[in-house]
Amino acid sequence: MGKAYTEEMQQLPATIEWAAGQPVDLLRRAVQLYSDRGLLAVGSGGSFTGAALAAELHLRAYGQPSQAITPLDVFQLPAAASTYAAGMILSAEGKNHDVLAAAKQLLVRGCPAIGLTLRSDSPLVRFSDATGAASLACFDMPWGKDGYLATNSLMATLILVWRTYVGAHETGHQLPK
């Protein structure tokens, strides 16, 4: 079983500080590479919230139609989607079967994909490294196993996605203290 919720909440300040200090240059460059395409941000559970943020920020930053979708939605995409969009796979631990199936499906469809995971050693990372399915920005969350609500993973993902799109060098776009 995961951590008690009070432990998760006590960890949040350290998580925010950690996420604010991680390098996002690789993910930022990958996003910029596909700035001329729409974004199909793939996430399930808490990562779907991160996918929704990524889709919104991609639309605002580049004016490209973007959408948060579940891994199951990847299987229902029109064939032409890979011509006009790139995938972004978000997964805290990179081990859920639905996310792995979505990565495989994006590869089969020829849809370029990037992604973010909070574990540098996971089935998603190994699959992507072996097949080129996605260019992943991998981080190693220092708080260990999340509790049921995955509060720290969610907060870290949101901050990393936000920092990817809204450069810390831009005035007025700093994380609150």
Model-flagged regions — what are they?
Residues L33-P176:
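Glycine-rich phosphate-binding loops that contact phosphosugars or nucleotide phosphates
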Residues M1-R37:
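An N-terminal, well-structured beta->alpha segment
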